[in-house]
């Protein structure tokens, strides 16, 4: 059997894995090899993603978000942090950064939430592609659509991978056009470990093509 299955539906992270190490992708996603586990960084990111999604859908109020994070953190972030970080007290720092972000969260003023955690399937270069748009926003003044992705990266780490991050947004923009018959005007990232710092670029048709 080949490492890449014809009928497999790819996410953006999986496309990256295939590009960087096809065999590693095969073991993790196709064979589901033992020993390849979620890490604490990913678990914390998933928890904050989920809480933001529940707020966007009206399941949680803004006031409930930090308490929900505090309650679920020990239940969902169960992995150990890397030793080199743990000895420096990073585990507590990571928790505190997430809590502070949610405690000070004030929504997305000036924007209307069109959809949250929007899962979709489309075709990329003849292969099935599956993605999840964290939030699709509409500018209340202009009516422009904005693709928003929540990221747990620090600003330094984000800058190192910034161009690659925006490639993901361009793939998501394809779905926005297919569903809403117009392209998003802006591609935005919400860096919640940086207090909700926003990084964005305008959508450019020539870069998409």
Regions found by a protein language model. Give the residues of each.
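Mg2+/Mn2+-dependent nuclease catalytic core
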Residues: 111-114, 118-209
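Short, compositionally biased low-complexity segments
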Residues: 18-26, 60-78, 184-194
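Short amphipathic alpha-helical segments and their helix-coil junctions
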Residues: 1, 5-7, 22-35, 72-73, ...
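Nuclease catalytic cores
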Residues: 12-60, 117
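A non-catalytic, helix-rich entry segment at domain boundaries
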Residues: 50-119, 123
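Short, solvent-exposed segments of well-ordered alpha helices
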Residues: 9, 39, 160-163
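Hydrophobic (often cysteine-bearing) scaffold residues that line and stabilize catalytic clefts
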Residues: 40, 44, 48, 90, ...
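An acidic intrinsically disordered interaction segment
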Residues: 2, 6-20, 127-138
């Amino acid at each position: 059997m080949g490492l890449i299955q014809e009928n497999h539906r790819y996410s953006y992270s999986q496309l990256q894995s295939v590009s960087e190490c096809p065999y590693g992708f095969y073991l993790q996603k196709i064979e589901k090899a033992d020993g390849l586990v979620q890490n604490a960084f990913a678990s914390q990111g998933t928890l904050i993603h989920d809480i933001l999604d529940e707020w966007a859908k009206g399941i949680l109020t803004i006031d409930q978000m930090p308490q929900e994070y505090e309650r679920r953190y020990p239940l969902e972030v169960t992995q150990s942090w890397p030793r080199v970080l743990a000895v420096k007290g990073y585990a507590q720092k990571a928790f505190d950064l997430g809590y502070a972000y949610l405690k000070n969260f004030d929504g997305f003023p000036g924007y209307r939430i069109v959809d949250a955690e929007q899962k979709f399937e489309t075709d990329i270069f003849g292969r099935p592609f599956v993605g999840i748009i964290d939030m699709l926003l509409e500018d209340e003044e202009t009516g422009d659509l904005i693709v928003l992705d929540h990221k747990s990266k620090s600003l330094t780490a984000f800058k190192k991978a910034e161009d690659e991050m925006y490639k993901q947004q361009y793939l998501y923009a394809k779905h926005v056009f297919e569903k809403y018959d117009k392209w998003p005007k802006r591609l935005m990232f919400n860096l919640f470990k940086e207090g909700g710092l926003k990084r964005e670029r305008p959508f450019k048709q020539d870069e998409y093509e």
